[in-house]
Amino acid sequence: MEALVYTFLLVSTLGIIFFAIFFREPPKLPTKKN
């Protein structure tokens, strides 16, 4: 049961870091809406 908790915390932390870096830097996608 503890393994599931640690796995969930690890995935959530990586997701938060990923979105933080993605929204901090300008998206390098070919979308010129703004």
UniProtKB/Swiss-Prot annotation:
One of its GO terms (biological process) is photosynthesis. It is a single-pass membrane protein. Its main location: plastid. It comes from the Eukaryota. Pfam families: PsbT. It is found in: Plastid, Chloroplast thylakoid membrane. The chain crosses the membrane at residues 3-23. Keywords: Chloroplast, Membrane, Photosynthesis, Photosystem II, Plastid, Thylakoid, Transmembrane, Transmembrane helix. The keyword Ribonucleoprotein does not apply. One of its GO terms (cellular component) is photosystem II reaction center. InterPro entries: PSII_PsbT (IPR001743), PSII_PsbT_sf (IPR037268). Found at the monomer-monomer interface of the photosystem II (PS II) dimer, plays a role in assembly and dimerization of PSII. PSII is a light-driven water plastoquinone oxidoreductase, using light energy to abstract electrons from H(2)O, generating a proton gradient subsequently used for ATP formation. Belongs to the PsbT family. PSII is composed of 1 copy each of membrane proteins PsbA, PsbB, PsbC, PsbD, PsbE, PsbF, PsbH, PsbI, PsbJ, PsbK, PsbL, PsbM, PsbT, PsbY, PsbZ, Psb30/Ycf12, at least 3 peripheral proteins of the oxygen-evolving complex and a large number of cofactors. It forms dimeric complexes. This is Photosystem II reaction center protein T. The lineage of its organism: Eukaryota, Viridiplantae, Streptophyta, Embryophyta, Tracheophyta.
